[in-house]
Design a protein with these regions (language model features):
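N-terminal secretory/membrane targeting signals
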Residues: 1-28
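Glycine- and aromatic-enriched membrane alpha-helices
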Residues: 24-448
Length: 448
């Protein structure tokens, strides 16, 4: 715990030092953008049928990542007496987040009140109708596409507290967290006037917005809820690796909609994004398996599928800027670094991140967010021109990551404190944990 406290203190220091720099950059960029807008107003965009068709498909693919992709992946990793509880968590998060996105989330994330907060002008999709546009696609389609990201991000955190957290506490925590952590960070990075976007932060599909926030939130939850009974001496083995492999396959395919869909167009950029996404996942799979082979003498199926997800998480922020060489490098780095974080570092620090959300998504998202600064350069196969400054971009990426880490850390702690009071504690009783959450929380059994 002391080591964890030291790490968190260091991150807080980085954030406090670097926040003024990023805020100043955002202010200058916002003023410049306002001046341009005053000079000439852009004409209203017309609907592009090809782009609309692609984003409709991508929206379905990203929803497919959560139900059933992530649900099956997590369900296979837990014990037999908790398989339904994990499926229920992901399924209920999908339902609750969909309603919250309509009511509050979209407005907070994509309103234009300020560079730091979207405001309440679009509550319950106010002003959004079948005629309104977002670029050259219907705004309702953009609303739906972004809703799938709002769904999967809190669902990712489920893997950190499986088999021990109260169902009511889980629902309340993820609901508040999505609105006060995810939605504001989404606004900073992806809204047209968000201060991180204006400062030049690169994050096409959610290295910061999705993976770093989910990873840090997961770290806080698994520490505050506490480890599973018997951890770390007891052996917690996946009850169904075939389910894990099936879920991973769905995630891998769905990630094409996640990343390539974030280009919001059916064009060459989307095609390149799809290819580099696949290459990063493939490379990370190989590297993770090699690391296992060297350390344990055998490469496991679980290691291969976990490595692929690490590569997918890491390429998420970079997929719009890097070429195939950059994808191979980011995949290799994430495969090795995430393996170390999930296998070695977690054991040393002693926290029970049950399904390695921190090591795979948090660390993977950070790796990709930082490395994009290097591999976006044209000299390394990226899309940026000759005047691109790697050092300056790296500092921008580091600053945005640090701010997000500290913000997510602090808010997650506060939310969990409140949820613990409201729900009479965060975790189930020892007897309920022993019986398994399928029976104790839902009155059903996954296998009869």
């Amino acid at each position: 715990m002391k080591r964890i406290a030291c790490i968190l203190s260091l991150l807080a220091g980085i954030c406090l030092i670097s926040f003024p720099v990023l805020a100043q950059e955002a202010s200058e960029a916002t003023n410049a953008a306002a001046a341009v807008e005053e000079e000439a107003a852009e004409p209203a965009a017309e609907l592009n049928g090809a782009n609309t068709a692609w984003i409709l498909t991508a929206t379905a693919l990203v929803l497919f990542m959560t139900i059933p992709g992530l649900s099956l992946f997590y369900a296979g990793l837990v014990g037999r007496k908790n398989v339904l509880s994990v499926l229920m968590h992901c399924f209920m998060i999908t339902a609750v987040m969909s309603v919250l996105w309509l009511a509050f989330g979209y407005s907070i994330a994509f309103g234009d009140a300020s560079p730091y907060f979207g405001g309440f002008g679009k509550l319950f999709a106010s002003g959004v109708n079948s005629e309104s546009m977002s670029g050259d696609i219907p705004e309702f389609l953009f609303f739906g596409f972004q809703m799938t990201f709002f769904i999967i991000t809190p669902a990712l955190m489920v893997g950190a507290f499986v088999e021990r957290m109260k169902f009511s506490a889980m629902i309340l925590f993820t609901s508040i967290w999505a609105l006060v952590v995810y939605a504001p960070v989404c606004h900073w990075v992806w809204a047209g006037n968000g201060f991180m976007l204006e400062s030049g932060t690169m994050d096409l599909a959610g290295g910061i917005v999705v993976h770093i926030t989910a990873g840090i939130g997961a770290l806080v939850v698994c520490i505050m809820v506490g480890p599973r009974k018997g951890y770390p001496t007891a052996q917690f083995q996946p009850h169904s690796l075939p389910l894990c492999v099936t879920g991973t396959g769905m995630l891998w395919v769905g990630w094409f909609g996640f990343n390539a869909g974030s280009q919001l167009a059916a064009n060459g950029d989307a095609a390149q994004t799809l290819v580099v996404t696949h290459l990063s996942a493939a490379t990370a799979t190989i590297v993770w398996s090699l690391a296992e082979k060297i350390k344990n003498g055998k490469a496991s199926v679980l290691g291969a599928v976990t490595g692929s997800i690490a590569g997918l998480a890491a390429i998420t922020p970079a997929s719009g800027e890097v070429g195939p060489i950059g994808a191979l490098a980011i995949g290799a780095a994430s495969g090795l670094v995430c393996w170390y974080a999930s296998v070695i570092l977690k054991s040393k620090l002693g926290y029970d991140d049950s399904l390695d959300v921190v090591g795979v998504h948090g660390v993977g998202g950070l790796v990709g967010t930082l490395l994009v600064a290097f591999f976006a350069a044209s000299s390394l196969g990226g899309k940026q021109g000759a005047d691109y400054a790697i050092g300056g971009q790296f500092m921008t990426q580091l600053t945005s990551s640090a701010i997000t880490i500290v913000y997510t850390l602090v808010l997650s702690i506060i939310i969990l404190k409140v949820v613990g009071i409201v729900c009479g504690g965060l975790r189930v009783s020892e007897s309920e944990e022993q019986d398994g959450l399928d029976i104790s929380a839902h009155g059903e059994s996954g296998y009869n």
